Amino acid sequence: GVRLAPDGSWQAEFEYLLAQGKKWADNTRAARLPRHLVRQSMASTIMKTMEYPLAITCFTKSQCEALMKPILKVGLSGSGLMNNFPRVVVFGPHSRQGLAIKHMYTDEGVQHITRFQRFTQDKHDMTGELMVANLQEMKMYLGLNGAIFSHSYKTLGHLVERTYCQWTWEFMDTYGMRLDDNIQDFK
């Protein structure tokens, strides 16, 4: 499961995942596994634990990096690599000679965008209905028509409350992405 808070805070989930990462790091360090098994363990256990809640969480980039820190420290050194191995290589794809470890923040953003594309298209899906309602609320609050994700977050983002849609809008704007929606405009 995922630890949710009524106020929309993700602190309990953050603390839980941080504890899981530290526990994995301590257990892996104590186990003295062969290098190939450390890498395999990292990919098949703790990284799956970290990826599971990302579809709904709204962690900041610094929170994601704090969650990854104990895992990368033990995972890289246990795999025979330096702890301070360049992160561009660590998070880079195999096709570019990277290690293909997913950065949690990027993975979180991609999962949010994927869910928007998938769920807002189905008018009979409860998740989609909630996303549409949140988008409509943001549009009404800002007094905007058109696709909300096509507007500049840097200009307007400070005017809306922290929500799932707001986080996704911030992520997309940070990386220069735009997404059209089929949400009906107000008249």
Region roles according to the model:
Residues 46, 64-76:
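Short amphipathic alpha-helical coiled-coil/interface segments
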Residues 1-61, 79, 110-130:
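Basic, alpha-helical interaction scaffolds
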Residues 67, 81-187:
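Extended C-terminal regions of large enzymes
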Residues 27, 71-72, 76-85:
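Mixed-charge, polar/low-complexity N-terminal
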Residues 22, 47, 72, 101-105:
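Residue-level recognition of well-ordered secondary-structure positions
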